[in-house]
């Protein structure tokens, strides 16, 4: 089970976006990276295609999972993730407050 999943609210721990919060759009476990909405935005030069015109577009670049932490459901501050079994299911738990992260 992954500690950070698609749809999670995360806080950036280091880099140019340190302290900012965002929602995980995609997780790439093989590369140990994630795409986060509004975080690590870079400008890319787009070549013209039949459907898209040329220009400079802004898009999110992947950020390493070690630079992200789950936002605590209670206070929004960064927390580590633990696991616990409840009703026969393995669930993620915020170490900071003990609150369930999913369901």
Swiss-Prot record:
Annotated function: One of two assembly initiator proteins, it binds directly to the 5'-end of the 23S rRNA, where it nucleates assembly of the 50S subunit. One of the proteins that surrounds the polypeptide exit tunnel on the outside of the subunit.
Disulfide bonds: none
Organism of derivation: Brucella anthropi (strain ATCC 49188 / DSM 6882 / CCUG 24695 / JCM 21032 / LMG 3331 / NBRC 15819 / NCTC 12168 / Alc 37)
Family named by the database record: Belongs to the universal ribosomal protein uL24 family.
Cellular component GO terms held in the UniProt record: ribonucleoprotein complex; ribosome
Origin superkingdom: Bacteria
Alphabetical list of CDD domains matching this protein: KOW_RPL26
UniProt GO BP: translation
Keywords: Ribonucleoprotein, Ribosomal protein, RNA-binding, rRNA-binding
Any GO molecular function: structural constituent of ribosome
Protein name according to UniProt: Large ribosomal subunit protein uL24
Family matches, as InterPro entries: KOW, Rib_uL2_dom2, Ribosomal_uL24, Ribosomal_uL24_CS, Ribosomal_uL24_KOW, Translation_prot_SH3-like_sf
SUPFAM superfamilies: Translation proteins SH3-like domain (SSF50104)
């Amino acid at each position: 089970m992954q500690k950070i999943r698609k749809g999670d609210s995360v806080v950036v721990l280091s880099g140019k976006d340190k302290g900012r919060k965002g929602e995980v759009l995609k997780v790439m476990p093989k590369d140990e990276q994630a795409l986060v909405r509004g975080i690590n935005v870079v400008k890319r030069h787009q070549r013209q295609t039949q459907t898209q015109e040329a220009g400079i577009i802004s898009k999110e670049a992947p950020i390493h999972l070690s630079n992200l932490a789950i936002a605590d459901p209670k206070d929004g501050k960064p927390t580590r993730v633990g696991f616990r079994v409840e009703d026969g299911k393995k669930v993620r738990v915020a170490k900071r407050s003990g609150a369930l992260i999913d369901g």
